[in-house]
């Protein structure tokens, strides 16, 4: 079950910038898509583009986290790695701190890094619920999560 993460946990971006979770969340709520470090994760890039295409202009920091190295994250995300803030979590400390069991996951953290809500595995309905909550907190339009050609719903992969 997802839980409040450790706000003092150091997290490194694919560009090599390391800050604590608390520092990353200083100004905005966080919308974080945590992908599995598997080739199948590339199929979720269009979903990420739809979600962050709407929420990217809101007072929400849109982040993709891959529990692996920057080279694996870049291989999974392709050009999308240049569009979003990408966190790399090779030791899975962030994933474990959140208490995630299944990936992919969509996580909403408040500015103080407490958990608002999360969806684990790929259920368009559950992810829509999370994005609706993010949009409500940000006073913003809620993105349409599901789309043609998306991966089939799945319980996901072990975190």
Predicted regions and their residues:
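The conserved beta1-alpha1 loop
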Residues: 34-36
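Histidine-centered metal-chelating micro-motifs
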Residues: 92-95
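Short acidic-hydrophobic, aromatic-tinged amphipathic segments that line or gate anion-handling sites
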Residues: 12, 85-90
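Non-globular targeting/processing and membrane-anchoring segments
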Residues: 1-30, 39, 43-82, 97-102, ...
């Amino acid at each position: 079950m997802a839980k409040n993460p450790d706000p003092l946990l150091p997290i490194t971006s694919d560009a090599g910038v390391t800050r604590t979770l608390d520092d990353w969340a200083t100004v905005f709520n966080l919308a974080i898509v945590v992908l599995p470090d598997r080739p199948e994760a590339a199929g979720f890039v269009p979903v990420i583009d739809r979600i962050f295409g709407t929420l990217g202009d809101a007072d929400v920091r849109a982040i993709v986290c891959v529990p692996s190295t920057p080279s694996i994250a870049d291989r999974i995300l392709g050009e999308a790695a240049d569009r979003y803030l990408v966190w790399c979590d090779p030791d899975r400390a962030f994933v474990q701190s959140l208490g995630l069991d299944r990936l992919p996951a969509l996580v909403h953290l408040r500015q103080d890094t407490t958990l608002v809500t999360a969806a684990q595995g790929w259920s368009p309905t559950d992810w829509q619920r999370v994005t609706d909550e993010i949009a409500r907190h940000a006073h913003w339009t809620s993105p349409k999560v599901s789309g043609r050609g998306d991966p089939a719903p799945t319980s996901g992969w072990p975190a």
